[in-house]
Curated annotation (Swiss-Prot):
Annotated metabolic or biological route of this protein: Antibiotic biosynthesis
Stated family: Belongs to the thioesterase family.
EC primary class: hydrolase
Name of this chain's protein: Thioesterase PikA5
Protein encoded by which gene: pikAV
Active-site residues, as the UniProt record annotates them: 99, 233
A Pfam family the protein falls into: Thioesterase
Described function: Involved in the biosynthesis of 12- and 14-membered ring macrolactone antibiotics such as methymycin, neomethymycin, narbomycin and pikromycin. Responsible for removing mis-formed acyl moieties (aberrant decarboxylation) that are bound to the PKS and could block it. Catalyzes the cleavage of methylmalonyl-[acp]. It exhibits some acyl-group specificity, and catalyzes the cleavage of propionyl and butyryl derivatives faster than acetyl malonyl or methylmalonyl derivatives.
Taxonomy, superkingdom: Bacteria
UniProt keyword annotations, A-Z: Antibiotic biosynthesis, Hydrolase
PANTHER family associated with the record: S-ACYL FATTY ACID SYNTHASE THIOESTERASE, MEDIUM CHAIN (PTHR11487:SF0), THIOESTERASE (PTHR11487)
Length: 281
């Protein structure tokens, strides 16, 4: 790869549901496998007014369904770096990713720090085991019936879509491509990030147990904290307000902003005991 970002159309990749040109910081939001930018509409609405969400639309879905999907985390990250260049050239950019999006956010942050000398304001990784752990099992290689059973198990997709053959025909290719990207991603050890990292997870997530999410602490030399919420892999769906408050507070505190609502990173619950996970080294 060259040091120069790809030439991509930011308008295709980035959706600004609540534009805030004078925001203190912008948070790039990267969706899960099969997800889209619209998943973050509520997220964008609930964030602190000084934090603007830039929601990423991967190719191969919704208004980009005619485009081929990208099937690797690294390729997705390269395109996100290029699409967000107008904002990271200004500074004041942070990243949030859920599941597949967490891996893409991590790789994007690594490219910015190591190739472009840009330190993100923060990295927020949700519902994803640390990249240094063993790869996921290869769900994307299952037949349709077994693949859909796995989708149902995670409870993140409206059952009406899974029972509609026409809709399935439209969304299955993107789902499989995204799962392939997530499951074939191999972490290549390199210098740690220096930006603050906050890991978020549901306390009953079968794909991202809390002890494995906590291993994200090994991937930054900067501040780290872990926040657990009640729920499974898609714990976000019922707790947008609390999650947005926690992220806004953490982001504004780590930036030293005077209008943050709290002065400490949030506390997480692990195995029933309250523990703080800031710089646990």
């Amino acid at each position: 790869m060259t040091d120069r970002p790809l030439n991509v159309d930011s308008g295709l990749w980035i959706r600004r549901f609540h534009p805030a040109p004078n925001s203190a910081v912008r948070l790039v939001c990267l969706p899960h496998a099969g997800g889209s930018a619209s998943y973050f509409f509520r997220f964008s609405e609930e964030l602190h007014p000084s934090v603007e969400a830039l929601s990423v639309q991967y190719p191969g879905r919704q208004d980009r369904r005619a485009e081929p999907c990208l099937e690797s985390v690294e390729e997705l990250a390269e395109h996100v770096v290029a699409a967000t260049e107008p904002w990271w050239q200004e500074g004041r950019l942070a990243f949030f990713g859920h599941s597949l999006g967490a891996s893409v956010a991590f790789e994007t942050a690594r490219i910015l720090e190591q190739r472009h000398g840009v330190r993100p304001e923060g990295l927020y990784v949700s519902g994803r085991r640390a990249p240094s752990l063993a790869p996921d099992r290869l769900v994307h290689q299952l037949d349709d019936r077994a693949f859909l059973a796995e989708i149902r198990r995670l409870s993140g997709t409206d059952e009406r879509f899974l029972q509609d053959d026409e809709l399935l025909r439209l969304v299955l290719p993107a789902l499989r491509s995204d799962y392939k990207a997530a499951e074939t991603y191999l972490h290549r050890p390199s210098a740690k990030l220096t930006c603050p990292v906050m890991a978020l997870a549901g306390d009953r997530d079968p794909k991202a147990p809390l002890n494995e999410v906590a291993e994200w602490r090994r991937h930054t030399s900067g501040p780290f904290c872990l926040r657990a919420y009640s729920g499974g892999h898609f714990y976000l769906n019922d707790q947008w307000h609390e999650i947005c408050n926690d992220i806004s507070d953490h982001l504004l505190v780590t930036r030293g902003a005077p209008d943050a609502r709290v002065v400490q990173p949030p506390t997480s619950l692990i195995e029933g005991a309250a523990k703080r996970w800031q710089n646990p080294r």
